[in-house]
Regions:
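Short, acidic/polar
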Residues: 51-69, 128-142, 212-223, 279-289
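A short, well-structured beta->alpha microelement
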Residues: 56-64, 385-406, 413-416
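Hydrophobic targeting/anchoring helices
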Residues: 46, 78, 118-120, 147, ...
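Active-site-adjacent "subsite" loops/lids of carbohydrate-active enzymes
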Residues: 34-60, 92-100, 104-147, 153, ...
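Acidic (Asp/Glu)-rich catalytic clusters
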Residues: 62-69, 91-102, 143, 220-225, ...
Length: 648
């Protein structure tokens, strides 16, 4: 049940937000005030554009095209990329143009050697004197003109030349590249820059493939601390139709992870316009980065924002008639063409509209919170699993050190890189905490004979079981079906896990031909609970689990969390430490979400519309202990939309 009060105030707030976006678009070029209260905006200018902007007419025309659509506080002016250098004589003149308009100008470098004959990325070969000389020249040029430099995310090492092979010797490629890139950071980049400009600050941008960094010399441990700051590559693009298949939740999680590595030194998040089948996807990446509380958003890049062609809505036919968070028609209406032009809205207008919208409430959100998940430095295993879990409504806080004080700890296979992990698990359980380990971690610890059976007599066999039917434990051995009535569930393959009856409890299990496989096992140890989460052989099949299975899974894993949702897959929950939260749907259809919060909550206040949502009690009692004594609300989400709430 919902009721809306103070409707006029709600409509006024929405209208003001729309007018604010329009005002940004119409602001004259000389204005220096910041319309965004909760973040700043930067635009990255690649070197080919830097060379074009040496022409004053081109600079004025392209600037006006972008500025009429989105306000920005800073530009990163690139001096080198892909064997191309900027003209040093033009850099100061271009920088002066922006500074006269109150826009900060920093330098940029992309240490990218180009593509090989197979169209694959080539890093510099740091054993090749020619590449070393180019690197030093680019760094010196940037330091000569700018006091702050950002490195785009190609500062890695992927060549295997004969010189590299000789230098590697008996080391693994990972150890060799990590050692070499620490030397490169210290001497060829930071050292070379400070010889030219002792005051220069160098920021390194780390990309979105963090699970594989160590294999190419990216080092979030020691190298990241050498630089004045770090930056987050939040580009996730399309989650299915791109080579990386990065899930939407990563745009949020990766910023939180890098922030946890260097608190207050992660300068912002970076999003591009590439690989999106529908325009809403670009807005979602911007929003999710800012939901993670990034202080700056960098728009990559200048040429995509400056093109005179209109932006296309893309493949959004299924929800074109819905009132979605990214309202295409409202975005188009908010565009104000510069006087005397026939300009049309482009990518910059999409960014301006999306950014102006969330700025109205971001300041009301507290510090992001989530289930602590431990990823040791230089680790991999069950790669990117936390992002899939985020996409099924489990908030994650990815951290580089074991969270010894967290009430609940999630450990995936990559945590096996910590040789003291089992002892830390035991200590957390003895202190009364809950520890969730995945089937991949269970298998890794068993292979390494790390003593996990001292905690629970649970064994990974790996035998594949194709599951279509699901059951939840009630009491006394009784079960309840977790399939959706009249819906034929798709088969999901799980590895078999053995356990002793009445020693561990399969609170969720799959059934196949009168044979069961545990999906969530629960086992008591000292004062805590150990859970084993069985991950499908294809982790993307988490999205195929029926909604009752996902609801039950969240009910156990989030039993100690202040907010929880019942929802299908592809609905994310972002929570904060001041009784605020966001629910966001990546689905192409409307969805109804039930939200559970603490007992005694009177209402949810929508932070955008000011609508008040009243409690909606569950008619059928749930067997889940986490639902006892909680207050629930029903929230409706349009396709590809979010809603932000305060609990009151």
């Amino acid at each position: 049940m919902m009721r809306q009060t103070n409707r006029g105030a709600g409509l006024l707030a929405v209208l003001c937000g729309t007018l604010a976006v329009a005002a940004v678009a119409a602001r004259p070029a000389g204005a220096a005030e910041r319309p965004y209260r909760n973040f700043s905006v930067a635009v990255y200018i690649p070197v080919n554009s830097t060379r074009q902007l040496a022409n004053p007419q081109t600079l004025r025309r392209q600037f006006q095209r972008i500025w009429s659509q989105v306000h920005f506080d800073k530009v990163y002016l690139e001096v080198y990329r892909d064997q191309v250098f900027a003209n040093p004589a033009s850099l100061d003149r271009i920088a002066a143009f922006f500074r006269r308009r109150g826009i900060t100008v920093d330098g940029g470098i992309t240490l990218f050697a180009g593509r090989n004959k197979y169209n694959q990325y080539n890093s510099f070969d740091f054993e090749n004197p020619r590449d070393v000389a180019i690197c030093e020249r680019a760094v010196r040029m940037a330091a000569r003109h700018f006091n702050t430099i950002i490195l785009d995310d190609f500062t890695f090492f992927n060549t295997r030349s004969n010189a590299d092979i000789r230098a590697k010797g008996q080391l693994s490629w990972t150890r060799y590249r990590l050692r070499k890139m620490r030397w490169v950071a210290k001497h060829l980049i930071i050292g070379a820059a400070r010889k030219v400009n002792p005051r220069v600050k160098v920021i390194i941008k780390y990309p979105n493939w963090y699970e594989h960094f160590q294999g190419l010399g990216f080092d979030l441990d020691r190298e990241a601390k050498m630089f004045s700051g770090i930056y987050t590559g939040d580009e996730t693009r399309d989650p299915v139709h791109t080579a990386q298949m990065l899930q939407q939740y990563e745009s949020y999680l990766i910023y939180r992870y890098y922030h946890n590595i260097r608190p207050h030194a992660d300068k912002g998040g970076w999003v591009d316009t590439f690989g999106d089948r529908y325009v809403d996807r670009y807005a979602e990446q911007l929003w999710d980065t800012l939901f993670a509380k990034a202080p700056e958003i960098t728009l990559f890049s200048w040429p995509q924002l400056a093109v005179p062609e209109p932006v296309s809505p893309g493949e959004r036919y299924a929800w074109a008639a819905d009132r979605t968070s990214f309202d295409w028609n409202a975005m188009v209406r908010s565009f104000k063409a510069p006087p005397g032009t026939e300009a049309v809205p482009g990518w910059a207008q999409v960014a301006g509209y999306a950014l102006g919208q969330v700025d109205t409430f971001l300041g009301k959100l507290g510090r992001p919170i989530g289930i602590a998940s431990y990823k040791p430095f230089q680790s991999s295993g069950e790669d990117f699993l936390q992002n899939y879990l985020g996409n099924i409504g489990i908030p994650i806080n990815l951290v580089p050190h074991f969270p010894a004080d967290a009430p609940v700890v999630l450990l995936t296979e990559e945590a096996a890189a910590d040789p003291q992990l089992v002892q830390k698990i035991e200590a957390r359980l003895k202190a009364g905490g809950d520890v969730i380990i995945t089937s991949g971690l269970l298998h890794a610890l068993e292979r390494a004979h790390r003593g996990i059976r001292n905690v629970a007599a649970i064994t990974y066999t790996g035998l594949p079981i194709a599951v279509r039917h699901y059951l939840g434990s009630i009491s006394g051995g009784a079960t309840a079906g977790l399939n959706v009535p009249a819906e034929r569930a798709k088969r999901v393959i799980f590895p078999q896990i053995r356990f002793y009856t009445n020693d561990s409890w399969p609170v969720i299990q799959g059934e196949a031909a009168a044979h069961g496989v545990p999906i969530l096992l629960m086992s008591g140890y000292s004062r805590g609970q150990l859970y084993v989460l069985n991950v499908p052989s294809n982790m993307g099949d988490l999205y195929r689990l029926p909604e009752p299975v996902l609801n039950t899974l969240r009910g156990y894993l989030l039993a100690r969390f202040p907010v929880r949702i019942n929802a299908p897959a592809h609905v994310a929950l972002f929570a904060y430490n001041n009784n605020t939260f966001i629910v966001e749907s990546y689905l192409p259809r409307p969805v109804t979400v039930r939200v559970f919060v603490h007992h005694g909550a009177r209402e949810l206040l929508d932070l955008r519309s000011l609508e008040q949502v009243l409690p909606a009690p569950i008619v059928t009692p749930s067997p889940l202990p986490s639902e006892q004594g909680q207050t629930s609300f029903v929230v409706r989400l349009a396709p590809h939309s979010y809603r932000a709430f305060a609990i009151r």
